[in-house]
UniProtKB/Swiss-Prot annotation:
Annotated organism of origin: Azobacteroides pseudotrichonymphae genomovar. CFP2
Protein name: DNA repair protein RecO
Origin superkingdom: Bacteria
GO biological process: DNA recombination; double-strand break repair
Family of this protein: Belongs to the RecO family.
Cellular component GO terms, alphabetical: bacterial nucleoid
Gene3D superfamilies reported for this sequence: Nucleic acid-binding proteins, Recombination protein O, C-terminal domain
InterPro entries: ARFGAP/RecO (IPR037278), DNA_rep/recomb_RecO_N (IPR022572), NA-bd_OB-fold (IPR012340), RecO (IPR003717), RecO_C (IPR042242)
Keywords annotated in UniProt: DNA damage, DNA recombination, DNA repair
Taxonomic lineage from the root: Bacteria, Pseudomonadati, Bacteroidota, Bacteroidia, Bacteroidales
């Protein structure tokens, strides 16, 4: 049976000389892997931009629940993303976020609210012209709202610790190693105040920004079983150096 669905490209890998496997997040089915002919041989009108991380596409697909790899009948661009393709800094952010999404949501079923959050976030990044160095911080921590472990920021005051295991600020040092020290917890509190509208007003040094994303990733390791190391983190760091 054929279905139509919006989708977000995450990454692709070579299958053989003629085919690739493209991993996407679909609105209707959640994360799905599709077998596609490589660009020169494809017959489904796939453009090169389809394979770019975080491309927004519309698909007509076969879908069988027990089949590990599905098939695309037709694909077309849903929303063109010009700056994400041509801006090297934005492209690097896309590579990082696509890997992050694929690892954070690999066990996730279809969730239209989550899909729309990611879709709208990509459009925000497309249209921002400058001052987007905090974008990945906002995106990653806000995604945890849809996964059920967004931190509680209501009780923060200066000098508190941030307990990563429980996602809360506490007065005393937690009896485990997964916490942010009281000297640095103010950064977490600032992070939780940020959104796409106000993120331009929050200034961090390069080292603070590196520390924040490392803490966010550790937070995901603690709360998502199987969440593995993000290989493209070094690429992200390099563009902001």
């Amino acid at each position: 049976m054929l279905y139509k669905t919006k989708a977000i490209t995450l990454y692709n890998i070579n299958y053989n000389d003629n085919y690739s496997i493209v991993h996407v997040l679909t609105e209707e089915f959640g994360p799905v892997s599709y077998l596609t002919a490589k660009f020169k041989k494809q017959k489904t009108h796939l453009s090169k931009s389809f394979f770019h991380p975080l491309s927004l596409v519309e698909l007509e697909v076969e879908h069988k629940n027990l089949r590990e790899i599905q098939y695309i009948k037709e694909a077309k661009t849903y929303i063109p993303l010009v700056s994400l393709l041509n801006n090297p800094i934005k492209s690097s952010i896309c590579i990082f976020l696509a890997e992050f999404i694929s690892k954070a949501l690999k066990e996730k079923q279809s969730d239209k609210l989550l899909f729309n959050y990611i879709l709208q976030s990509i459009q925000v990044l497309e249209f921002i012209e400058k001052n987007y160095s905090n974008f990945h911080l906002v995106f990653t921590i806000r995604l945890s709202q849809f996964l059920g472990f967004y931190p509680n920021n209501t009780d923060y005051s200066k000098g508190m610790y941030f307990d990563m295991q429980n996602g809360i600020f506490v007065q005393q040092q937690p009896p485990h190693t997964h916490f942010v020290h009281s000297d640095d917890s103010w950064i977490v509190a600032k992070l939780l105040q940020m959104n796409y509208e106000n993120m331009f007003h929050f200034q961090f040094t390069r080292n603070e920004r590196k520390k924040i994303i490392s803490q966010i990733l550790e937070y995901y390791y603690l709360h998502l079983g199987g969440f593995s190391k993000i290989k493209s983190l070094a690429i992200l760091h390099s563009v902001f150096d």
